[in-house]
């Protein structure tokens, strides 16, 4: 019921406006314009007469990421309004049925955008980043774990670390903390899994890290498949070499069973485990489960608590991470725009105005020795231990 309430309140906020949505403070005429490009999918939720297409009390979860990011952006705008900051948000629905995002950008009226914030897929990012490069407009992506094949674009910033960065960080963490322990990578067969392996092998070879053992498991793997690769005389670091969350859970549960026998093991995984609360359950007790993620918010700071209080009293719900990511993105880059104005492109790696987490925005240099884009290289490591998750670095 809580999810139902928050969804309809957010959706109602969106459909009050015609496309593109405009949200602004009561400020002087000259203001900075930030494009907010999100998958709102309003055409799938309402008809031409603004009637909802869904049955009563239906909860369309696929709409939530864009709507939640939008709500976080509006809350940040409200905070900026208290400072009388001249900010205008121009909101475009990247999944609009009538016009694709490229057409919407080309037809955008009014003064040019000063900056674009986007939650999108890889195809959309290529279109948006090309537009930003052509118009000299910084484009900040908040969600993609890859660069969409983009090169030579000094106006692009990826706040979500790429898969390569995540893999390298995990390997370096294991090497620094467990130098002398055997590492076994359990994986399923697949193209993405092969790419993950290539990242690790390339990194480990360059840094002269002891060679890891790779084991391809069948779909119906059992405890026996795992124990055959473990050593009863010493600890083993096990790594899930896939982004498949279900594979990771199955691996964790069976390794927990193994750990109750003669084996001492620890398990490491990638950020797809970040949304899972299942590791608190009894079947995962007995082993340490560690993963890395570019986003971590303990929610103990004053701003996070204010957002949580607003959701609790107004929406009767708890804000998702996407709400807070919307807030932090608008807050950080609106303030950078206000401070640096037309020179914002020279500050895309700035660590100013960070709210909930530390970021390390670094230039990524391509094969042609050119600046391809900026990427957040900061990874947080979290560990599930006996049903409790804690930050370890």
Language-model regions: role of each:
Residues 16-18:
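Hydrophobic membrane-targeting signal helices
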Residues 2-12, 21-393:
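Extracytosolic ligand-binding ectodomains
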């Amino acid at each position: 019921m809580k999810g139902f309430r928050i969804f309809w309140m957010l959706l109602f906020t969106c459909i009050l406006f015609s496309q593109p949505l405009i949200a602004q403070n009561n400020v002087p005429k000259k203001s900075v314009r930030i494009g907010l490009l999100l998958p709102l999918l309003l055409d799938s939720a309402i008809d031409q007469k603004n009637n909802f297409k869904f049955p009563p009390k239906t909860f369309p979860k696929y709409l939530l990421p864009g709507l939640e990011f939008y709500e976080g952006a509006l809350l940040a705008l409200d905070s900026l309004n208290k400072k009388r900051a001249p900010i205008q948000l121009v909101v475009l629905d990247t999944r609009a049925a009538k016009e694709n995002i490229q057409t919407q950008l080309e037809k955008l009226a009014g003064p040019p955008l000063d900056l674009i914030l986007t939650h999108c897929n890889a195809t959309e990012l290529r279109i948006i980043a090309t537009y930003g490069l052509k118009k000299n407009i910084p484009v900040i992506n908040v969600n993609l774990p890859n660069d969409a094949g983009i090169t030579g674009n000094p106006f692009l910033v990826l706040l979500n670390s790429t898969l390569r960065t995540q893999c390298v960080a995990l390997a370096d963490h294991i090497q620094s903390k467990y130098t002398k322990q055997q590492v076994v990578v359990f994986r399923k067969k697949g193209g993405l899994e092969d790419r993950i392996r290539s990242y690790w092998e390339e990194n480990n070879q360059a840094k002269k890290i002891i060679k890891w053992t790779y084991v391809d498991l069948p779909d119906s793997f059992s405890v026996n498949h795992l124990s055959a690769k473990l050593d009863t005389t010493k600890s083993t670091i096990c790594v899930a070499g896939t982004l498949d969350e279900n594979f990771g859970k199955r691996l964790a549960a069976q390794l927990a069973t193994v750990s109750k026998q003669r084996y001492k093991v620890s398990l490491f995984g990638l950020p797809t485990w970040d949304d899972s609360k299942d590791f608190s359950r009894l079947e995962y007790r007995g082993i340490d489960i560690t993963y890395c993620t570019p986003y971590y918010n303990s929610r103990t700071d004053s701003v996070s608590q204010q957002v949580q209080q607003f959701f609790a009293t107004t929406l009767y719900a708890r804000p998702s991470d996407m709400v807070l990511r919307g807030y932090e993105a608008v807050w950080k880059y609106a303030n950078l725009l206000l401070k640096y104005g037309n020179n914002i492109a020279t500050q895309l790696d700035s660590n100013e105005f960070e709210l909930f987490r530390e970021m390390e925005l670094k230039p990524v240099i391509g094969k042609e020795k050119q600046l391809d884009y900026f990427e957040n290289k900061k990874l947080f490591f979290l560990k599930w231990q006996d049903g409790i998750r804690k930050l370890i670095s």
